[in-house]
């Protein structure tokens, strides 16, 4: 298993819509053992994104975790993020590869998209596996079988996303994904740190064959 895959087991995407700040949520997840944090924010100014990004970068370093910025390669470069995550409507993966030196994750919702971008990507974010309300432009759910087809068609690590929680995570992990990406399973929980710890332990036990 590569170093990157080790970090991707539970991948938390921060969301401030649930009453806590990006920084508060990230630190709770990091304390629980999450080792990949993505900062996704579509509504703030570039200046505010930079300020929050710098704080998240410092936090993730404290916990030896990887830090990704969604879409904004400029912010990722400015805060020295480990990686950037881009969608199908963002900068093309091949162009991002020319200007960004770190990890690049690319969203894919079908085999065609996955195969098109895998040679430029360090990992693929695949989904939504289940119907989701957290991302307005997420598209139709691909289901477990859709996820499995994509995992089997590419050679880079796949991180599954889309309404994944501790009730359905094992079913998702059985497809061979490197990890699961979550938002509301942690951010919307009454106790985000506990929710994150339960997910981390669940994935650890699955990967250990327990």
Swiss-Prot record:
Task: Provide the binding site for 2-[(2R,5Z)-2-carboxy-4-methylthiazol-5(2H)-ylidene]ethyl phosphate.
Answer: 132-134, 183-184
Q: Which GO terms describe its cellular component?
A: cytoplasm
Which reaction is recorded as catalysed by this protein? Answer: 2-[(2R,5Z)-2-carboxy-4-methylthiazol-5(2H)-ylidene]ethyl phosphate + 4-amino-2-methyl-5-(diphosphooxymethyl)pyrimidine + 2 H(+) = thiamine phosphate + CO2 + diphosphate; 2-(2-carboxy-4-methylthiazol-5-yl)ethyl phosphate + 4-amino-2-methyl-5-(diphosphooxymethyl)pyrimidine + 2 H(+) = thiamine phosphate + CO2 + diphosphate; 4-methyl-5-(2-phosphooxyethyl)-thiazole + 4-amino-2-methyl-5-(diphosphooxymethyl)pyrimidine + H(+) = thiamine phosphate + diphosphate
Q: Which cofactor does it need?
A: Mg(2+)
**List of residues binding Mg(2+):** 71, 90
Pfam families noted in UniProt = TMP-TENI
Q: What is its EC number?
A: 2.5.1.3
A Gene Ontology molecular function term of the record = thiamine-phosphate diphosphorylase activity
Pathway it works in: Cofactor biosynthesis; thiamine diphosphate biosynthesis; thiamine phosphate from 4-amino-2-methyl-5-diphosphomethylpyrimidine and 4-methyl-5-(2-phosphoethyl)-thiazole: step 1/1
Question: How is the co-factor bound, per the entry?
Answer: Binds 1 Mg(2+) ion per subunit.
Q: Which GO terms describe its biological process?
A: thiamine biosynthetic process; thiamine diphosphate biosynthetic process
Arranged from A to Z, the UniProt key words for this protein are:
Magnesium, Metal-binding, Thiamine biosynthesis, Transferase
Record Gene3D superfamilies: Aldolase class I
Superkingdom, natural source: Archaea
List positions binding 4-amino-2-methyl-5-(diphosphooxymethyl)pyrimidine.
Answer: 38-42, 70, 107, 135
UniProt enzyme class: transferase
So what family is this one in? Belongs to the thiamine-phosphate synthase family.
Function per UniProt: Condenses 4-methyl-5-(beta-hydroxyethyl)thiazole monophosphate (THZ-P) and 2-methyl-4-amino-5-hydroxymethyl pyrimidine pyrophosphate (HMP-PP) to form thiamine monophosphate (TMP).
Alphabetized NCBIfam families for the sequence: thiE
**Under what name is this protein listed?**
Thiamine-phosphate synthase
């Amino acid at each position: 298993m590569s170093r990157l895959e080790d970090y991707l087991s539970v991948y938390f995407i921060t969301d401030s819509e649930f009453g806590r700040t990006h920084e508060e949520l990230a630190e709770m997840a990091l304390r629980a053992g999450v080792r990949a944090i993505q900062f996704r924010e579509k509504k703030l100014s570039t200046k505010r994104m930079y300020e929050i990004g710098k704080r998240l970068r410092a936090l993730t370093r404290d916990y030896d975790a990887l830090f990704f910025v969604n879409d904004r390669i400029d912010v990722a470069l400015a805060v020295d993020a480990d990686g950037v995550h881009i969608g199908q409507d963002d900068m093309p993966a091949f162009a991002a590869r020319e200007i960004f030196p770190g990890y690049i994750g690319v969203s894919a919702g079908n085999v065609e998209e996955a195969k098109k971008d895998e040679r430029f990507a360090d990992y693929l974010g695949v989904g939504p596996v289940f119907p989701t309300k957290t991302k307005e432009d997420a598209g139709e759910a691909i289901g477990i079988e859709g996820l499995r087809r994509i995992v089997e068609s590419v050679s880079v690590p796949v991180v599954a996303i889309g309404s994944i929680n501790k009730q359905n995570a094992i079913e998702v992990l059985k497809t061979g994904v490197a990890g699961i990406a979550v938002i509301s399973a942690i951010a919307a929980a009454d106790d985000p740190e506990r929710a994150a710890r339960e997910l981390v332990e669940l994935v650890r036990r699955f990967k250990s064959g327990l």
